[in-house]
Curated annotation (Swiss-Prot):
Gene: rpmB
Species of the source: Rhodopseudomonas palustris (strain ATCC BAA-98 / CGA009)
Highest taxon listed in the record's lineage: Bacteria
Keywords, sorted A to Z: Ribonucleoprotein, Ribosomal protein
Family, similarity comment: Belongs to the bacterial ribosomal protein bL28 family.
Biological process (GO), any one: translation
The protein's name: Large ribosomal subunit protein bL28
Length: 101
């Protein structure tokens, strides 16, 4: 399992640990990933994803998983998230739009 967010594509970065005597040694900065179960309103089911806490905050800010995925670019999503995005878009396109009366 890679250490990469399935929604934002955040991954590990490489940097230096710097000692008091300014000796630099390589280290990895890992993203803060959590396993989360999202509820898709459109699909009507639960979806488990491994996302960063920053992405979790972004999903909440945009109004849920469906809204986040529809607005996100496919290039930065994981294959699982792209499949979800397409399923949500297909389901939303198939539903008739309720006319305001």
């Amino acid at each position: 399992m890679s250490r990469r967010c399935e929604l934002t594509a955040k991954g590990a970065q490489v940097g230096h640990k710097v000692s008091h005597s300014n000796i630099k040694t390589k280290r990895r900065f890992l993203p803060n990933l959590v396993n989360v179960t999202f509820l898709s309103d459109t699909l009507g089911r639960a979806v488990r994803l491994r996302v960063s806490t920053n992405a979790l905050k972004s999903v909440d800010h945009r109004g849920g998983l469906d809204a986040y995925l529809l607005k996100a670019r496919e290039a930065e999503l994981s294959p699982k998230a792209v499949e979800l995005k397409r399923a949500i878009a297909k389901k939303m396109a198939g539903e008739p739009v309720a006319a305001a009366s």
